[in-house]
């Protein structure tokens, strides 16, 4: 029942959250009060972030390793957790593993010859281990900066001093134990960010977390960069394969699962799907994949994008579509 807001919110901030199945009819009832639904969804996420920050403080760890699959919201969530730590008096810094890329010329390739962007060998693992070891022992290190325009490491660096605080290391390989091999166990706290809400009609699952993530990634690229969904859709199977090989196997090593689901997001996606389909021409398998995904949202009441708060995590994916 949507009136039981306190019970719902408590359920959604447990440390390890099983996936929950929400009836689309129940969502549609809640969508009749869109502002209240959006407020509840946003409040629930903020409470989950605050709880994650509390668990980090309780652990006394200096280094937080935060990962999640593509479009799980891990990057923005890392910054949200850092903000929550700062608000409670704990200095916090976010480190992106993207800055440890070796460079395009060093990327491994898949059997078909294409670049394997998901492979951990794209990263300078030895440098990551050294930087994390420095932070663990001295609280200081020098970080590389990656230049995405040239796809190579910049000559510039960044000096980081934790000043008694915490660093949050975010990236798809953050839970890979090779990264923290030189850091003592008590100094590391591990978080897996992922969606935990799926949707059903008469008990039959019709929208799963992969569907939501595909929409997030595709709609973000279309709205923010004017990019056709063709490239995103064409890469999707490869992305999922990389997650299976390199990310999900370490999920059970996490100390905390940060749920990045927003119930009202369902209506935002429903609003945007048709717009993107009319804006771009899709063909072949990509058209079939997108149309099949769109059909899953046929019974979802759409919501206005203006419901998105300025500081919402979802702005990472839909902010550019808000007029």
Stretch-by-stretch model annotation:
Residues 83-93:
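Post-Walker A helix-loop "phosphate-sensing" segment adjacent to the P-loop in P-loop NTPases
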Residues 58-60, 129-187, 232-250, 265:
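Glycine-rich phosphate-binding loop used to anchor ATP phosphates in small-molecule kinases
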Residues 64-66:
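Hydrophobic anchor at the beta1->P-loop junction of P-loop NTPases
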Residues 93-95, 102-149:
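Conserved nucleotide-sensing/catalytic segment adjacent to the nucleotide-binding pocket
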Residues 74:
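Conserved lysine of the Walker
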Residues 77, 81:
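Hydrophobic positions on the alpha1 helix immediately C-terminal to the Walker A/P-loop
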Residues 13-14, 34, 39, 180-323:
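Conserved NTP phosphate-binding and transfer environment spanning the P-loop NTPase/kinase superfamily
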Residues 12-50:
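Charged, amphipathic alpha-helical linker segments immediately N-terminal to NTP-binding catalytic cores
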